[in-house]
Amino acid sequence: SIRLFYRARTNAPSVTQLQDVVNIRNVLFPSVGNPDLLQDYTHSIIARYQFTNSAKRTSFFANLFLQNTQNYITNASYLITQDSAISSSIILRRGARLTKPVNLDGYWSARSFFTLGLPLNFMKSNLNLNAGVTYSKIPGLIDNVENTSNSYNYNVGAVIASNISEYVDFTVSYSANFNTIKNSIQPELNNNYFNHVASFQLNLLSKTGWLFQNDLNNQMYRGLTNGFNQDYWLWNMAVGKKFLKDQKGELRLSVFDLLKQNQAISRTATETYIEDVQNDVLQQYFMLTFTYKLRNFGSGAANKARRTQ
């Protein structure tokens, strides 16, 4: 089946974007609002194709998205050439860049995503392959000169999910993203970077109620700022026992980040700058949990009411 959609929407500027107040929380990148901002208008076209073969248990999905925005709310960046006192408590330092939201036309975005699913009968599993391409054209102003940031993202992935039994379940997955950024007037901001995620999940349950869960992930980043090109493992594990009547009770011991390598790295690419951020995240911890399942809660009263009618 094929489906086509058209959608239109508006986006009003936020209160922060409209306030004519200087924010110096980041002294290198101070910002100020713009009370003259207009709302933007976005037009979207969406195309979807779906094919399934129930007999062979295969499927194929294709999605295409195209978007254009008028009066796009973007950023203008201005270099501070000398120390400037806005007030007794606010001083813009020489070398900083002041950012201000403005309206510009010329924003475009296109995205495609494809998925193929098929069975792996020899190992009682299903295989899903996916791939996609994303393009975005973002206008901006740098020292009153219009800059266009062209961003390209290419991604591929694969997932093998088992369908063996209720006692054995595993999932193996891999995804890779390659990104490239090209700017019209700031070639020093042009950049290529790559990241991938590989994971393995295993769930085992015995007929006597013992359970084991394993979740292992590897994440790698390349092409980021020095110090951000990381390669680390995140390993979570749990063991437990189901007990009581009908195995309604469960006692489980879990450990998060067994190798103490958990990290959080992100990249923000805008029309005026590229920023790499590493945040503090929760490190290794252990957790003991008890769970009791309340099955058919209230069913006795409902059955009695039906019998009396």
Residue ranges of each PLM-predicted region?
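Exposed, low-structure sequence patches enriched in small/polar residues
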Residues: S1-Q309
